[in-house]
């Protein structure tokens, strides 16, 4: 089974994540998404991208199953490779509309916020749950989330790790269109087509102006996020956060 289903709808490239039910990501999945964005950038006939997912969740976060790096240095290098692929998505030149169903949790929320626009439903759940894991936000969220909803509301979501349902997400500005679960993808496609109907040169020029310096700022902040995640990953609190999440209970954190 492929990790992505790629198709075309007129001038829209459809990038469907295909790791159901929860579409956890890793470096390889991000590489494939970035490659698809590169294809769009090189093809003048593609004017926008629709990023969606097959399954219950849009993306419920990073994949922690399977063999993990054994040493702190290896874990840091592994995270560096992952973020390098994520940065490639931010560098894409064509607009991305994300159809966000189910959960967009942790790094999965970061993937959703890498898009230019998000379409969600009342049942969609966003959560930057990093502090609930004894961890630090990643995937450039310390840039993208405050940019969307302001620094105070972003701090509230980061420091509490609270879950935000679709209607509140719409009020906050986390999503741009609120649709029913049944019409979510169709509404996202409608927006992607609307963008594709505009002048490609005008869209490219305007988007570049609006995003001036954004990728460079995300790259700088990713380095900070990686530094913080690297030392926090070695703490007892992080181990407790992972256990508590797996056991569906509150963490008993000891600040060590």
Locate the predicted segments by residue.
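Conserved CoA-thioester-binding segment of acyl-CoA-metabolizing enzymes
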Residues: 1-54, 87, 91
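Terminal peptide-recognition signature
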Residues: 15, 33, 51, 63, ...
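Short, charged, surface-exposed hinge/linker loops at domain edges
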Residues: 207-216
């Amino acid at each position: 089974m492929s990790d992505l289903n790629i198709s075309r709808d007129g001038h829209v490239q459809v990038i469907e994540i295909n790791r159901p039910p929860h579409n956890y990501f890793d470096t390889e999945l991000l590489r494939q998404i970035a490659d698809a964005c590169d294809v769009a950038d090189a093809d003048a006939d593609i004017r926008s991208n629709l990023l969606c997912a097959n399954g219950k969740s849009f993306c419920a976060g990073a994949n922690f199953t399977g063999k993990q790096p054994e040493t702190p240095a290896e874990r840091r290098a592994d995270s560096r490779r992952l973020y390098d692929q994520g940065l490639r998505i931010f560098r894409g030149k064509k607009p991305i509309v994300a159809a966000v169903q189910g959960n967009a949790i942790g790094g999965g929320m970061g993937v959703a916020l890498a898009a230019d626009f998000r379409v969600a439903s009342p049942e969609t759940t966003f959560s930057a749950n990093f502090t609930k894991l004894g961890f630090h936000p990643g995937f450039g969220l310390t840039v993208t989330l405050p940019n969307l909803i302001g620094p105070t509301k972003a701090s509230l979501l980061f420091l509490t790790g609270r879950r935000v349902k679709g209607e509140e997400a719409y009020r906050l500005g986390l999503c741009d269109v609120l649709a029913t679960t049944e019409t979510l993808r169709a509404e996202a496609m409608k927006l992607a087509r609307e963008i594709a109907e505009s002048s490609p040169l005008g869209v490219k020029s305007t988007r570049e102006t609006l995003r001036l310096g954004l990728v460079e700022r995300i790259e700088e902040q990713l380095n900070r996020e990686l530094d913080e995640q690297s030392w926090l990953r070695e703490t007892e609190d992080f181990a407790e956060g992972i256990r508590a999440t797996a056991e569906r209970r509150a963490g008993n954190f000891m600040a060590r």
